[in-house]
């Protein structure tokens, strides 16, 4: 019995081993959820991207503001948290549920909720440790403006199937970018 308890304790510790040196401890499952969310986004595709070429739009993803090379490790958490929250806002809207397979959408949103909880846990660890530098505020504002452009686009296109397909592909790009940021920061460890 003692060995079983020791084994379970080791498993618990390993599952919360930091995934990167961000000034906080993200559980290993955070990266797995991110990969799963990307996979779910691919599975959610309902239309061929070729059929929606006329609806494509450059939303101006703020790559330079989100790039791990440009922001410090501790600044990455609020930016990634904002990015995740904004994606969740789009996919939990009432108009979103009509556009997607409900099972895939629910799984996707659940993964995002868990990622957001991980990131917010890190934010709580950072409270009082650092003030938000101006570059971080710029990055947060750039992320908010980016998602505002996406929301306006969906409204202008009346949440059409092609508009949702364009947004799905764009969100995949944003989530991929956040995974790349975490990967680069982990390499700096």
UniProtKB/Swiss-Prot annotation:
Residues carrying a glycan: 101
What does UniProt give as GO cellular component?
extracellular region; extracellular space
Under the heading Gene3D superfamilies, the entry gives: 1.20.1250.10
Please report the PTM annotation for this entry.
Answer: Glycosylated.
Cited InterPro entries = 4_helix_cytokine-like_core, Interferon_alpha/beta/delta
> PROSITE patterns under this entry?
INTERFERON_A_B_D (PS00252)
Q: Where is the signal peptide?
A: 1-23
Its main localization is secreted
Please state where this protein is localized: Secreted
The alphabetical list of record keywords is:
Antiviral defense, Cytokine, Disulfide bond, Glycoprotein, Secreted, Signal
GO terms (BP aspect): defense response to bacterium; defense response to virus; natural killer cell activation involved in immune response; regulation of defense response to virus by host; T cell activation involved in immune response; type I interferon-mediated signaling pathway
Keyword Disulfide bond applies: yes
> What PANTHER family does this protein map onto?
ALPHA-INTERFERON-RELATED, TYPE I INTERFERON
Name this polypeptide is given? Interferon alpha-1
State the gene name recorded for this protein.
Ifna1
């Amino acid at each position: 019995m003692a060995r079983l308890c020791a084994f379970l304790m080791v498993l618990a510790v390993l599952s919360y081993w930091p995934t990167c040196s961000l000034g906080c401890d993200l559980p290993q499952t955070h990266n797995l959820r991110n990969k799963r969310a990307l996979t779910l986004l691919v599975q959610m595709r309902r239309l061929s991207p070729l059929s929606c070429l006329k609806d494509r739009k450059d939303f101006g993803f703020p790559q330079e503001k989100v790039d791990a090379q440009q922001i410090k490790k501790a600044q990455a958490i609020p930016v990634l948290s904002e990015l995740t929250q904004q994606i969740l806002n789009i996919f939990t809207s009432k108009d979103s549920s009509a556009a997607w397979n409900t099972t895939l959408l629910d799984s996707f949103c659940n993964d995002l909720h868990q990622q957001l909880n991980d990131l917010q846990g890190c934010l709580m660890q950072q409270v009082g440790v650092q003030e938000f530098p101006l570059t971080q505020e710029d990055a947060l504002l750039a992320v908010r403006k980016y998602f505002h452009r996406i929301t306006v686009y969906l409204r202008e296109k009346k949440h059409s199937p092609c508009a949702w397909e364009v947004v799905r592909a764009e969100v995949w790009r944003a989530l991929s970018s956040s995974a790349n940021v975490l990967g680069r920061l982990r390499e700096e460890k």
